[in-house]
Design a protein with these regions (language model features):
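Conserved beta-strand signature within the Rossmann-like core of class I S-adenosyl-L-methionine
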Residues: 72-86
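Conserved SAM/SAH cofactor-binding pocket of Class I
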Residues: 1-52, 62
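Short amphipathic alpha-helical segments
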Residues: 22, 62-66, 88-90
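Active-site capping/gating segments
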Residues: 5, 83-121
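A short glycine-rich, Lys/Arg-flanked "PGG" loop and its adjoining helix->strand segment in the class I
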Residues: 60-76
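Short, well-ordered alpha-helical microsegments
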Residues: 43, 58-59, 84-85
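Conserved beta-strand segments of alpha/beta enzyme cores
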Residues: 7, 32-34, 75, 96-99
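Short strand-turn motif at the edge of the Rossmann-like AdoMet-binding core
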Residues: 13, 55, 79-83
Length: 121
């Protein structure tokens, strides 16, 4: 709605969720929003940004979605609970964390953060 020039693809393995996104896009006349029923590891279209929430460990997330990341400028964003030090240590050698943003969720007394990653140059 705010950025009509930005294409957004919401990928989910659950067909009903992808269909809901498609229906919402039609109802709201959002030509730039797409619901995609697929597994992230099957995507071949390059994306500038790939994000996830409650999906997988960081190593699995970057491994499974790597073929869809637009290299060399693409970035990954992963919402996690507390700072995932063990997952960061287990990342592939060519993947770097370049920012971790701590989040405060109103009404939720739990740690949350967003981890920003990219392929090392």
């Amino acid at each position: 709605i705010c950025c009509p020039d930005v294409d957004v693809s919401c990928v989910d393995t659950v067909g009903k969720k992808a269909a809901f996104i498609q229906q919402a896009a039609v109802a709201l006349k959002l030509r730039n929003l797409h619901g995609v029923h697929a597994r992230v590891e099957t995507l071949t279209t390059p994306f500038d940004l790939i994000s996830c929430r409650a999906f997988a460990s960081l190593p699995d997330f970057v491994t499974w979605s790597r073929s869809a990341l637009a290299a060399p400028h693409g970035v990954w964003l992963a919402m996690k609970g507390k700072h995932p030090e063990d997952e960061i240590a287990a990342l592939p050698a060519d993947v770097a964390v370049f920012h971790v943003e701590q989040l405060t969720v109103p009404g939720l007394d739990a740690e949350r953060c967003i981890v920003w990653l990219r392929v090392k140059n």
